[in-house]
Amino acid sequence: IATARSTTGEYTFAIFAVVTLALLISWVIAVGATPFIGTWLLKERAGGHHEVFDSRFYRALRAAIEWCMRHRWLTILATVAAFALGVVGMGATEKQFFPNSDRAEILVEMWLPEGASYQATEREAKRLEAIVAKDPDVASFVGYVGNGSPRYYLSLDQQLFRPNFAQFVILTKDVPGRDRAVVRLRRILDEQFAGIRARAFRTPLGPPVAYPVQFRVMGPDPGALKRLGDQVAEVVRRNPHTLDTHADWGERSPAVRIEIDQDRARAIGLSSAQVARAVGAAISGATIGTLRERDKLIDVVLRAPPTERAGLGQIAGLQIQTALGRSVPLSQVATIGEVMEEPILWRRSRTPTLTVRADTVDGVQAPDVAMQIDPKLAAIRASLPPDYRIEVGGPWEENAKAQRSIAAGAPMMVAAVLALLMVQLQRFSLTAMVLLTAPLGLIGVAGALLLFRQPFGFVAMLGAIALGGMIMRNTVILVDQIRQDLDAGTPAWEAVRESAVRRFRPIVLTAAAAVLAMIPLSRDVLWGPMA
């Protein structure tokens, strides 16, 4: 985690810091304070202490270990079978990147059609504001028109400044109230804001992701991308677990196209830049100065009145000032026409990219939904022209990035672990045996996740890695005890059996301590799967 160069590594770096600090402190206590406390509490007795490992429990444990050793092939077969079941069980677990948070907050986003004015967006935002203010589960809320909320917590997906966009951050009285309010808001948005693309959702955790299900269609021609995007959207829409499937380009909208006749423009001393500035100033306005009002500076904008820019005829009659001081109508140097075009074109690595996005219904995991949809896009992928491709985005892609960032630092960490094991064990065979025990943690991981119906996400993956380290630590303790007994002249069979008996209590106690430490985290939405 410490070497991961990704937003996920940044988000979860605290795990590395806390675990490292805890292990260092526990090591200091183990080699310093624990022996001192032991010599202080465990006084010598006349006649000596009784044999600790000769109780009824230890006799039964010794017999069980003896049986496993005598039937070693059966024991190995059972272990391999349990491991295979664990691998199969991992395939049956729900997949997750990061869960929704347990904050009593709801985010509402509203998109009017591209080209809608700030005033139109504000009117719709005020309509929703009046509805939210009457909701019995809402404690407070704030709305933003033209842009999104400031990034008040790390997982918030930032929005661009757009006049057709509005966002609400709604704080409810409690988490159950949040769940009730989000259902009501979704119904209200569907029924009363039918002409607007709107969504209400719980605040997420993890690196910012715009939508839980995303598929990117990439290629050179925007028209072909639009057609392919419609096909992909239809496949996504057919999945019963998706909501509000749409493309980020929006619907085609009318636009005015002005084509300048370069010969005529040059003949009267006009350039394309001069025409563009004049038309832009008349239609959109141009800042010609500032006005100071107390501690604020207000722009003074010069713009043609609405009657001179309301239609194609008025735009064609706009007067353009030439270098000679004469004014000519725009229609004299340009052809003005109305066309339908894409309101916004997104690019990724300079390639036109259309993203099909969708929300998911409650109770399902976004990576599972994406995994259900992706194979059904095989027919579309097979028919793609050259230079076109379809990629998976959203949490699935972010999860893959996070795993790659961790895998990039894995060789260095594996080398460090191998070096430490070789220093401790002094033999390749013992080191290999210790390493082979680490994957056995999947047996418990799969069983626990399926039993408690927890998803396997990024944090759970970190927990599985930590569990593998704990298993190797216990194996090192046992192997070291066996080696000490062998060096003392104990027969190999007896050394293995008695070492397992003697190290049983400390290994179980350390495991039990770890389990008890995880209990407070077991109900947390983020750390619960790891616990």
Predicted regions and their residues:
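Hydrophobic transmembrane alpha-helices and their membrane-interface caps
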Residues: 3, 21, 416-503, 508-527
